[in-house]
Amino acid sequence: MDSRLQEIRERQKLRRQLLAQQLGAESADSIGAVLNSKDEQREIAETRETCRASYDTSAPNAKRKYLDEGETDEDKMEEYKDELEMQQDEENLPYEEEIYKDSSTFLKGTQSLNPHNDYCQHFVDTGHRPQNFIRDVGLADRFEEYPKLRELIRLKDELIAKSNTPPMYLQADIEAFDIRELTPKFDVILLEPPLEEYYRETGITANEKCWTWDDIMKLEIDEIAAPRSFIFLWCGSGEGLDLGRVCLRKWGYRRCEDICWIKTNKNNPGKTKTLDPKAVFQRTKEHCLMGIKGTVKRSTDGDFIHANVDIDLIITEEPEIGNIEKPVEIFHIIEHFCLGRRRLHLFGRDSTIRPGWLTVGPTLTNSNYNAETYASYFSAPNSYLTGCTEEIERLRPKSPPPKSKSDRGGGAPRGGGRGGTSAGRGRERNRSNFRGERGGFRGGRGGAHRGGFPPR
């Protein structure tokens, strides 16, 4: 206790010395000569008491606190002098221009000193895109923590490699070539048109003819598509998102998925591209629209599709400026999903020639396509399918089995209990259209009529 009291006295003595220097007094003992006399202080106290009586209740709590705590005028004056001294010391400090260096001043949360994952601000600071920090995006390490899926992918890749046809390719100007000559009908069609958008973004002159969406719509894709088939259309990231859907409808497809290619810049952070004149921001992704033709249900058509094996995202490093190559992962997604072996790649290049695919494009340097030879690979019944092993069937994700009518609530068992003409809940009424039984003509979830009107 004595040490604490001694510490307080020393601090008070030091405070009085600082006040003496601030007020121009000779010593700490002569501060009273500089300050108001006792009579003047008494007058000030009386004035404060008078003002306190009429003090507005809306005044700041800090001001009322000083009056309520009963502090002496000398203590208040000392505190005021301390604040004044601190303020003057801050004003005397040399001015330093604040230079923005990082995002530490923009932390999320007012009570936290920990930097949060503000990847957008980090991109402004370093040039690293937010997608650079997504983990396990490669084909090799994507399923490291999912052994069941990893084994499924391995088995499917082995089966696909065994069932693939030899690679075939045809050098042809697709604009002048009649694609109806390609036989037989295809289960999967991949279109990779050289859109003007790709070259407009990079500012590089195209070394091949750029296709407009009007040109793409003129392709007779519906003539070479099987009744039950899928199409994958690379459409960029601009107007192609809408015009690509128009193409799918024209060819008889329904859009069922949108595969998004997210481009990272780990190897070259901060790189800026030529801004597309039609864009507000720099685009770092592209879209591949997926369409379905015919009736294909994942719960019943397990011989033709295996759903939920891959995701609808492709995350790879952005190619060099002028390179319009698409990621090879799109082929893996298609082959894992659709079990059809008749696969066509339009606007292909030498680098995209692949077993199991017929590649057609104007930039190919050679051709080996023979219609009869290609058709012979699928002459046997159901030979257009890759097939499936028992182990793959066991491992692959499946849809829940369809419920029976009694489980869904339809049919007679539920209709007689909750709805229908003899409703089980509630007492019978003599009125023919009484609706208190949750059934009758109102349609009591399984009764004779689903809605409020009889069927036409």
Swiss-Prot record:
What keyword terms does UniProt attach to this protein?
Answer: Differentiation, Nucleus, Phosphoprotein, RNA-binding, Spermatogenesis
Q: Residue ranges of region Positively charged region required for RNA-binding?
A: 245-254, 297-298
Where do transmembrane segments lie in this chain? none
The keyword Lipid biosynthesis appears for this protein: no
User: Which Gene Ontology terms cover its molecular function?
Assistant: mRNA binding; mRNA m(6)A methyltransferase activity
Where in the cell does this protein reside?
Nucleus
Is-annotated flag, keyword Nucleus? yes
Assembly behavior: Heterodimer; heterodimerizes with METTL3 to form an antiparallel heterodimer that constitutes an active methyltransferase. Component of the WMM complex, a N6-methyltransferase complex composed of a catalytic subcomplex, named MAC, and of an associated subcomplex, named MACOM. The MAC subcomplex is composed of METTL3 and METTL14. The MACOM subcomplex is composed of WTAP, ZC3H13, CBLL1/HAKAI, VIRMA, and, in some cases of RBM15 (RBM15 or RBM15B).
Entry function: The METTL3-METTL14 heterodimer forms a N6-methyltransferase complex that methylates adenosine residues at the N(6) position of some mRNAs and regulates the circadian clock, differentiation of embryonic stem cells and cortical neurogenesis. In the heterodimer formed with METTL3, METTL14 constitutes the RNA-binding scaffold that recognizes the substrate rather than the catalytic core. N6-methyladenosine (m6A), which takes place at the 5'-[AG]GAC-3' consensus sites of some mRNAs, plays a role in mRNA stability and processing.
In Swiss-Prot or TrEMBL terms, this protein is called N(6)-adenosine-methyltransferase non-catalytic subunit METTL14
